[in-house]
Design a protein with these regions (language model features):
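Terminal accessory carbohydrate-recognition/targeting modules of carbohydrate-active enzymes
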Residues: 1-157
């Protein structure tokens, strides 16, 4: 099953935070979040591993946050609702969301466009996040911050 959402349908945080995706690894683990990249449940992340299938799941890889500097401008692509209800609205740079068994977020800001892919290895507790960049030529300093964790998947951190 394939899904596509374009920029116009992704721009609003509140109307998209409840639209979710999920990918499973076949042994009880999974990845999942919203189509704008912000988690809205304690059990969402890029790898919720099942070490003892069906009874024991742990959040081990929550997500990645991206930001970059180009030509003196900083672009923070983080999308999140913080505990004080402050929003980080990186989804305003989101050009598309695609799901075909692999998740793909397409972003564009400044003179940089890039795609972020998220996938799980079948039959293993392994998550992959890959990036594909299209830069117009201006130098870019790109920072990826992985948010790791180790907690029971329904506990809050």
């Amino acid at each position: 099953m394939n899904y596509h959402f374009n920029h116009e349908s992704l721009a609003d945080f509140s109307s998209n935070i409840r639209k979710e995706w999920a990918v499973t690894n076949g042994i009880g683990g999974y990845a999942g979040s919203s189509i704008i990249g912000a988690h809205n449940r304690t059990h969402q992340g890029y790898l919720i591993a099942s070490f003892h299938p069906s009874v024991s799941r742990y959040m081990v890889f929550s997500k990645t946050n991206e930001r970059f500097c180009q030509m003196g401008n900083t672009y923070d692509l983080t999308t999140a609702m913080h505990s004080d209800h402050r929003l980080a609205e990186g989804q305003k740079y989101l050009q598309g969301f695609d799901y075909d068994g692999t998740v793909c977020f397409s972003y564009s800001a400044g003179q940089l466009s890039f795609k972020k892919y998220i996938s799980l290895k079948p039959d293993a507790n392994v998550s992959a996040v890959a990036y594909e960049f299209d830069n117009s030529g201006a130098e870019v300093e790109f920072t990826i911050t992985p948010l790791m964790n180790f907690r029971e998947h329904s506990e809050s951190s």
